[in-house]
A protein has these predicted regions:
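A short, surface-exposed interaction/processing loop segment used at functional sites
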Residues: 109-130, 154-167
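Acidic/hydrophobic-patterned starts of short beta strands in beta-sheet-rich repeat architectures
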Residues: 87-96, 128-134
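Beta-propeller blade termini
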Residues: 76-85, 122-131
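Beta-propeller blade repeat segments, especially FG-GAP/WD-type strand-to-loop junctions
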Residues: 102-116, 146-148
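Positively charged n-region of N-terminal signal peptides that target proteins for export
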Residues: 1-8
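C-terminal motif of bacterial Sec signal peptides marking the signal peptidase cleavage site
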Residues: 16-19
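Acidic, small-residue rich beta-repeat scaffolds with periodic aromatic anchors
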Residues: 22-49, 133-200
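Blade-edge motifs of beta-propeller repeat domains
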Residues: 26-75, 112-122
Length: 200
């Protein structure tokens, strides 16, 4: 019986080791590809009009987009950070245009790079674990991570506070203001802000 247990434990350790090595290899491949985009050597797929279904091949050097109110932005990459935005152990590349306070999140999937432009209030206080805060003019704040599917990305809220309507949620379940505030305070104190690297 002991011998069987030892064999079983060895098999579990081997599978875990292979799994870790495979994820590390995928992360290295993703970062190498994203680095080529950063160095303007490779294109990425992105929407040039927010809320449109159409995508085009872009280069970081000439990346531009149009918002829902038809404002036109020519994106100027100034700072970047590698961070796992969707908790799959594979890093995304987040690039910041300081002047217009817009972010470009680059995600590697199935040998392609996809880009998503994110406004300032939709990506506040990005943390090393990929979590971030969002805020709206209506007194609604949330903490969440991103989820990617090809050219689409969405925010998965871990916590949401609607002070205007006095509604509070943690992991999709309703809670009270005190518990919600503690969650936001704990997140603020116990997670680390990312360190941006200046693009030279």
């Amino acid at each position: 019986m002991k011998k069987l247990m030892v064999i079983f434990m060895c098999l579990v350790m081997c599978v875990s080791f292979v799994g870790c090595n495979n994820t590390e290899k995928q992360n290295d491949e993703a970062k190498e590809t994203l680095q080529r985009v950063l160095e303007k050597e490779q294109t990425f797929t992105a929407k040039t009009i927010v809320f449109s279904d159409k995508t085009t091949e872009q280069t970081l050097e000439k990346y531009h987009f149009q918002t829902i109110d038809n404002a036109y932005y020519s994106f100027v990459p100034e700072q970047y950070a590698f961070v796992d935005m969707d908790n799959d152990n594979i890093d995304e590349l987040v690039i910041l245009d300081v002047k217009i306070t817009y972010y470009l999140v680059l995600h590697y999937e199935n040998e392609k790079v996809y880009g998503y432009n994110i406004g300032a209030r939709s990506l506040i206080d990005l943390r090393t674990d990929g979590s971030f805060m969002t805020s709206s003019a209506g007194g609604i704040s949330s903490i969440g991570n991103m989820c990617f599917d090809g050219s689409e990305c969405k925010v998965i809220n871990k916590a949401l506070a609607n002070d205007y309507d006095q509604e509070y949620f943690i992991d999709g379940k309703k809670t009270d203001q005190k518990t919600s505030k503690k969650y936001f305070d704990d997140w603020n104190e116990n997670t680390s802000k990312i360190s941006w690297v200046t693009i030279k």
